[in-house]
């Protein structure tokens, strides 16, 4: 069984990780965020599998709840920022596909134009 002090320390570490991930999302450091997300998920899994001792008093329980609430608030903010980033990337992909289509159409037109500019077989004999 884990001590109340150790449990509080683990919850505070989880909060620290969630704050770090939120900061990374705000600053657009997506690669680093993904790396930290792995550590974060492992920390959450560790806490999920850690039973809360019965001898923890109501003040400590309240403190743990407050920490968890802040962690969940941070997760909601990160989720919003990730959705915004996904929308941006989706827009960029759409623009890229349009540009590719335009380039392909232009290439076809340019190829046909060259054929139109080629001299006719009768014109080469004169």
Curated annotation (Swiss-Prot):
Family statement drawn from the similarity comment of this UniProt entry: Belongs to the FliT family.
Protein name from the UniProt record: Flagellar protein FliT
Protein location: Cytoplasm, Cytosol
GO terms under cellular component: cytosol
Top-rank taxon, per record: Bacteria
Role played: Dual-function protein that regulates the transcription of class 2 flagellar operons and that also acts as an export chaperone for the filament-capping protein FliD. As a transcriptional regulator, acts as an anti-FlhDC factor; it directly binds FlhC, thus inhibiting the binding of the FlhC/FlhD complex to class 2 promoters, resulting in decreased expression of class 2 flagellar operons. As a chaperone, effects FliD transition to the membrane by preventing its premature polymerization, and by directing it to the export apparatus.
HAMAP family referenced in this protein's UniProt entry, alphabetically: FliT
Origin species: Pectobacterium atrosepticum (strain SCRI 1043 / ATCC BAA-672) (Erwinia carotovora subsp. atroseptica)
Principal cellular location given in the protein's record: cytoplasm
UniProt-listed InterPro entries: FliT
Subunit structure: Homodimer. Interacts with FliD and FlhC.
Chain spans, region FliD binding: 60-98
TM region positions: none
GO biological process terms on file: bacterial-type flagellum organization; negative regulation of bacterial-type flagellum assembly; protein folding
């Amino acid at each position: 069984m884990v001590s109340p002090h150790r449990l509080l320390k683990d919850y505070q570490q989880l909060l620290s990780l969630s704050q770090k991930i939120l900061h990374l999302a705000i600053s657009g450091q997506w690669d680093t965020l993904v790396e930290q997300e792995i550590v974060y998920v492992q920390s959450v899994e560790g806490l999920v599998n850690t039973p809360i001792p019965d001898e923890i008093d109501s003040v400590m329980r309240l403190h743990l709840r407050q920490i968890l609430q802040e962690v969940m608030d941070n997760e909601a903010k990160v989720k919003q920022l990730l959705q915004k980033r996904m929308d941006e990337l989706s827009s960029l992909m759409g623009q890229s596909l349009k540009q590719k289509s335009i380039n392909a159409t232009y290439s076809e037109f340019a190829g046909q134009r060259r054929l139109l500019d080629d001299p006719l077989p009768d014109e080469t004999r004169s």
